[in-house]
Design a protein with these regions (language model features):
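Glycine-rich, aromatic-bearing surface loops/beta-hairpins
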Residues: 139-190
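N-terminal secretory signal peptides that target proteins for export/translocation
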Residues: 1-7
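N-terminal onset of structured domains
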Residues: 25-70
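Short structured motifs
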Residues: 32-38, 58, 94-96, 136-141
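Bacterial N-terminal signal peptides
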Residues: 9-20
């Protein structure tokens, strides 16, 4: 009886310990999310502006220091809600940046993979700050929007490790190497 009670108690306590350990691990995990985003018309083009929080895990920082690049992917969708029909997709845009470390120059290099533009930074903090501020990114032509209608703009960021074969990524603890934000959605009315 006593042994059964001890075994039962152990099985009742273990789930609570697992929940506490998970909460502790999540509390220490660096913040990764979208803090703010908006679009504004400029010169006939709607432009995206956003501020991201790009906290890297220790594993991602170590991989970066060893020369493995990280890729930031920004997915943007614009849709028009309709009453009795499915939403109409107006535009989709995927923007990609690669963050790498150049050991020879001792610089962190950010490359916009869509345009080829690149910049070098002295520290990882400077490079992450530059990546975290999306400014005047052309999203869609104003002629695609109807005046007075309401549109939903959705934004999601993904940070993943690059340069490793898929077979190797599967062997690694995936949560450490890829992070995805929830969709950040807001309405606009041209």
């Amino acid at each position: 009886m006593r042994r059964t009670l001890r075994c039962l108690t152990r099985w009742m306590v273990l789930p609570w310990l697992a929940v506490a350990a998970l909460a502790h691990a999540q509390a220490e995990e660096p913040r990764f999310g979208i803090r703010n985003a908006f679009v504004e018309p400029r010169g006939g083009v709607w432009q995206l502006n956003a501020i991201l929080e790009l906290g890297l895990s220790r594993a991602a920082e170590n991989a970066l220091a060893e020369g493995v690049p990280l890729t930031l992917i920004l997915d943007t969708e614009v849709s028009r809600g309709r009453r009795f029909l499915p939403d109409e997709d107006v535009a989709e845009l995927q923007q990609r940046w690669q963050l790498g470390y150049d050991g020879l120059a001792q610089r962190y290099v950010v490359v916009n993979q869509n345009s080829g533009a690149q910049a070098a930074y002295a520290s990882l903090g400077e490079a992450l700050d530059a990546l975290a501020r999306i400014r005047e990114l052309p999203l869609l032509d104003e002629s695609l929007l109807q005046a007075g209608r309401r549109y939903e703009v959705s934004l999601r960021a993904t940070l993943e490790i690059g340069g490793l074969p898929e077979a190797v990524k599967v062997l690694l603890f995936w949560r450490e190497w890829s992070r995805v934000t929830d969709w950040y959605t807001w309405s606009v009315r041209p």
